[in-house]
């Protein structure tokens, strides 16, 4: 029998200390990694619930185990809310991650060796869009498109030319590091011209789409995938959405279970259901608009300070700071900002001369700082502090500047707590 009085701190102080330390890090560091956010306490409670105990292979009312009447209700709520939130006719809420959602779509719509056209990783795509180190580039004949070298924008003429030349079975639209609005209809037109499926990976902008501040691909693409964290601000996981097509829906369900996964994580699906309900509120819609407003303010401040932003600015939640030609690398910048308690990630930029482990760019995003309550004033201050740190790497006075910025970061973090004390 379990000891109800025992705490993690009592039983496993090593793990507990790591949990406490991570909580302190989240409170005392400014989070600018574009794919990270702070989920709500309600979602975290659901993920720590007794639903974690229940195996539920299959789908609601079609399980391979008994005792699923209550987890069926949870999954049905998640499905219906996902469909309502995104205007979808179909939703599968079981994928454990965005990558697994993408893998299921590949398995459902393509055969090994089929040609897939996706965005190059070093131009802002994702591993699962055809990168050679990923299943999508190993199991399939991946052809890659990128950005126009002069404009820094997605080159639809190149995509159309590649599609006509290679006749892909599926075109993948979406990104992990692109700061502009994609024209989903142009992708649809290209796919229709060559007889390809269109899959959209909207993992990075799903929250913006849910709030209506970024165009929705759901009724344009054959299939749309997303993570449930990032801008959506739910638990870590994935979902698959689609417009009505019984044949595709059947293939997608089979590709998730039993094709790629066994039992779904019912405690996480409960968290997804709660986060979808949160995303239906007016407060959430206002939050997503502030995410975009803050990103635009940040990009404008970087540009004002003389830094280059890939694509010339941002129309979503993220941007790439181009450091090509600087004496320091993306890795150097990442480390220096981290020492000042500002968390970013080094990122390759188009035509990057440095290796992917070093890079000549930074990817930054505003979802987490907006959740925290930052507005225009805080974003301008923060961006200027970042510029001060980056400039100090060339000026040779980085130690003093980093110490000064860290003190400012700790002060503003104290004024804008995430969850408060642990």
Curated annotation (Swiss-Prot):
| Chief location | cytoplasm
Copy the pathway line from the protein's UniProt record.
One-carbon metabolism; tetrahydrofolate interconversion; Amino-acid biosynthesis; glycine biosynthesis; glycine from L-serine: step 1/1
SUPFAM superfamilies in alphabetical order: PLP-dependent transferases (SSF53383)
InterPro entries, alphabetically? PyrdxlP-dep_Trfase, PyrdxlP-dep_Trfase_major, PyrdxlP-dep_Trfase_small, Ser_HO-MeTrfase, Ser_HO-MeTrfase-like, Ser_HO-MeTrfase_PLP_BS, SHMT-like_dom
Give one Pfam hit by family name.
SHMT
Return the broad EC class. Answer: transferase
Site (Plays an important role in substrate specificity) at 229
Sites where the protein binds (6S)-5,6,7,8-tetrahydrofolate: 121, 125-127, 355-357
Q: Which Gene3D superfamilies match?
A: Aspartate Aminotransferase, domain 1, Type I PLP-dependent aspartate aminotransferase-like (Major domain)
Its quaternary organisation is: Homodimer.
What is the role of the protein in this entry?
Catalyzes the reversible interconversion of serine and glycine with tetrahydrofolate (THF) serving as the one-carbon carrier. This reaction serves as the major source of one-carbon groups required for the biosynthesis of purines, thymidylate, methionine, and other important biomolecules. Also exhibits THF-independent aldolase activity toward beta-hydroxyamino acids, producing glycine and aldehydes, via a retro-aldol mechanism.
User: What is the recorded name of this protein?
Assistant: Serine hydroxymethyltransferase
